[in-house]
Amino acid sequence: MPETKPLRGPKPLAPGDRPARRVVRLVVNGQERQVAVRPSDVLLDTLRNELGLTGTTRGCDMGTCGCCTVHLDGVPTLSCLTLSLLAEGKDVRTIESVAPGPELHPVQRAFLSQGGSQCGFCTPGFIMTSVALLERNPKPDDAEIRFAISGNMCRCTGYNKIVEAVKVAAAELRGEIRPGPAPAGPWAPHGPHDKPRTKAARRPGSGGEGPR
């Protein structure tokens, strides 16, 4: 019988050695980019650290929060779990491409006007998920919206305002309502009973001023 030998993986790297990099071709926001990546590099790190596209945020690094959502060939994808090598030749779309001009995308406008964003950390992921939903389904109902965003986590809004924002954006994209002006800044009121704030609230004794 022929001698059989156990399968062996690659030899471990010596202390101080770094994994060899490989140049991959990525199509990011319509532009071809060549980047040298390690076998273990994930797309999130490549976008942020190598290409300077920091709009995609890092949340859990475990695929549970959805903050890092990008489009990969049109499909919402968690960039923290996607190896950069596997994205080679695919169409990668990040939050930076949603509104390349001076005007906001209807989804971005709706998130502002409806109060769908508070701390803003999770917002890029929600916007990317919502844009993908409305591109394939221009008139989703509440259940379809909630299902689509179920992979995105928000610790601030409670989701109702996010759902409302998606519905408003969908109506604008269908031409049923006119685009509304975006708030002038992060302190702009979102509703008839909200008052604009001029300074961030601070606890007494924290060294800052409270609201005036």
List the predicted regions and their residue ranges:
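Signature of N-terminal electron-transfer/Fe-S-associated modules in redox systems
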Residues: 1-212
